[in-house]
Amino acid sequence: KDYRTLSLEMLAQQLGFNKNYLGNLIKKETGDTFKQLLQRQRMLHARHLLVFSNYSMEEISEEIGYLDTSYFFRSFKKTHGKTPGQIREEALHRDL
């Protein structure tokens, strides 16, 4: 789950597939490109970390492969409709 270095090329090499073949197979089976699939997994992992860990926003951003925390915030809000801070705050209030 190292989102910082995961790439279609690396995955194809590990599986013994041609990069283009694997990309087309992923698109056919999921309806999403590898990049879209990876982005969704990153955001799901970030949400999990926000709810179930005490990691800082910067640590979460880095953990899922974003070097720019503000870009992570924008991507997260675009995906979830809420900021990372809002998700964490809701999780904290739910546990009370």
Located regions from the model:
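…primarily DNA-binding HTH/wHTH and HhH modules…
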Residues: 74-96
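Residues within helix-turn-helix
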Residues: 9, 20, 56-59, 69-70, ...
